[in-house]
Swiss-Prot record:
Biological source species: Vibrio alginolyticus
Quaternary structure annotation from Swiss-Prot or TrEMBL: The uptake system is composed of KtrA and KtrB.
Principal location: membrane
Effect recorded for residue 327 to C: Increases Vmax for K(+) transport
Classification via Pfam families: TrkH
Name of the protein described by the UniProt record: Ktr system potassium uptake protein B
Impact after mutating residue 402 to A/D/S: Exhibits very low K(+) uptake activity
Outcome after substituting residue 185 to A/D: Decrease in K(+) uptake activity
Effect recorded for residue 314 to A: Does not affect Vmax for K(+) transport
Effect caused by changing residue 322 to C: Increases Vmax for K(+) transport
Free-text note regarding domains: Contains four repeated domains, each composed of two transmembrane helices connected by a putative pore loop (p-loop). Four conserved glycine residues in the p-loops are part of a selectivity filter for K(+) ions.
Family, as annotated: Belongs to the TrkH potassium transport family. Ktr (TC 2.A.38.4) subfamily.
Residue stretches in coiled coil: none
């Protein structure tokens, strides 16, 4: 029962005090750094690179791989040895599945039982609200990832083995399957996928991998459980993803085709079918995959703006992708639409979205904006580059996309460290950083309501 205090303060004695969650964000960050730092040291060893790698470039590359971003300061295919490429594959897989998932797998393999706190952290990282068998859940996630990558491997091998031979063709197929499913964007070809702009098999295989990886296991698992019952029985998050993903893909494809079809440096020289294929691939890749089949440095300004918007929206929650997340964008959009219609509740698919979810979505957008603004300001101080390049590269790093407008290869030493921090924040999540800095202190006190002049 709510009680009123004489000084205008409400006390809520029957509400349970939420525990501060300052520890969880630190665990997430420490688990990330626990993989990152040793990996960076390994990449500096001669066995992993052809001509050596500085500690800064090694740290940048390791961060890009574990955060599944794909930005590179060196040519991945030419600079790294076979051992280095295998290490990058492992880092991409770890980054895509997440440190919590991989930690649980290793502990279960060695027969170690997770504590209740560890199980709670793992379930939160995997987006599970209901009680689930964590061991079974982790097994399903890993199985799904391996099966998806295996399917991609078969299709890409069919394309590349006849051209490159069994050993090289199969290795390239494996590397790019892992990179695509985990939305990492690392490619062994110097021009990314530009050599295959007219290749439907390669384009659709890679696009399929990063679309499924971007949906997330939560969505795939929900569809698998309820596909016979119908759309109505799906979780609201699944419904948002199943509608928003193809919608964003369609809008991006049409806009890229309209804006670039007459550009001789990108899609202008392609056939109509080739233009649509390139537009589709770029639209799918923009939301965190990081591959490009056309030269992005030659994109028109309007097309780059569309690319930036798609990168920022990103993929699904608990997926291998980044960005502010599709569901965050959808909730914020519907909250705005609800306000404009002067309604009291945010309703999606005949379900009322609870207020904490709405405020969390708005907080993610505000915190993300603050981080991006700060990073862009710092990069404009350290780099001699135009504002549009700085904006594109910063958002690409924050959304863990990996697409580049040409700035990454020219970054100064301070600029590289700024981008490293941005990639880390983008992968662990902006609110994780905010929780660590703000130190949440839940209170039982409720003050009287008042109005603030806005707008």
């Amino acid at each position: 029962m709510t009680q009123f205090h004489q000084r205008g303060v409400f006390y809520v004695p029957d509400g349970k005090r939420d525990k501060a969650k300052g520890g969880e964000p630190r665990i997430i960050l420490l688990s990330f750094l626990g993989v990152l730092l040793p990996s960076a040291v390994l990449l500096t060893l001669p066995v992993f690179s052809v001509s050596g790698l500085s500690i800064t470039d090694a740290l940048f590359t390791a961060t890009s791989a574990i955060s599944v971003t794909g930005l590179g300061v060196v040519d991945t295919g030419q600079h790294f040895t076979l051992a280095g490429k295998i290490l990058l594959m492992c880092l991409m897989q770890i980054g895509g599945l997440g440190q919590m998932t991989l930690s649980a797998v290793l502990l279960y393999m060695f027969g170690v039982r997770l504590s209740l706190r560890q199980q709670a952290l793992a379930k939160e990282a995997l987006g599970q609200e209901r009680q689930v068998n964590l061991r079974r859940l982790v097994k399903k996630i890993v199985t799904f990832a391996l099966v998806a990558e295996a399917i991609g491997f078969v299709f890409l091998s069919y394309r590349w083995v006849p051209e490159m031979g069994w050993q090289t063709g199969m290795f390239y197929a494996l590397f790019h399957s892992i990179s695509a499913f985990n939305n990492a964007g690392f490619a062994l070809f110097s021009d990314s996928m530009m050599s295959f702009v007219n290749d439907p098999l390669v384009s659709f295989t890679l696009a399929g991998l990063f679309i499924f990886g971007g949906l997330g296991f939560t969505v795939i698992g929900d569809v698998w459980r309820h596909w016979r019952k119908g759309f109505h029985f799906l979780h609201i998050h699944t419904k948002i993803m199943l509608i928003a993903t193809p919608l964003l893909l369609l809008v991006g494809t049409v806009l890229f085709w309209l804006l670039e079809r007459h550009n001789p440096n990108t899609m202008g020289s392609l056939t109509t079918g080739g233009q649509w294929l390139a537009a589709f691939f770029q639209s799918a890749s923009a939301r965190t995959a990081g591959f490009n089949s056309v030269d992005l440095t030659q994109f028109t300004q309007p097309a780059l703006l569309i690319m930036i918007v798609l990168m920022l929206i990103g993929a699904g929650s608990t997926s291998t992708g980044g960005g502010i997340k599709v569901s965050t964008f959808a909730v914020a959009f519907m909250a705005t639409w609800t306000f404009l219609r002067q309604k009291k509740h945010v309703v999606m698919f005949k379900r009322t979205v609870n207020w904490p979810t709405v405020t969390k979505s708005l907080a993610i957008i505000v915190v993300s904006g603050a981080i991006l603004t700060t990073a862009m300001f710092l990069l404009m101080l350290t780099e001699k580059a135009s504002f549009d390049k700085v904006m594109f590269e910063t958002i690409s790093a924050f959304a863990t996309v990996g697409l580049t407008a040409g700035l990454t290869a020219e970054l100064s030493e301070p600029g590289k460290y700024i981008m490293i921090v941005v990639m880390i924040i983008g992968r662990i999540g902006p609110l994780t950083l905010a929780y660590m800095l703000a130190r949440p202190e839940p209170t039982l006190i409720k003050y009287p309501e008042d109005t603030v002049l806005t707008g």
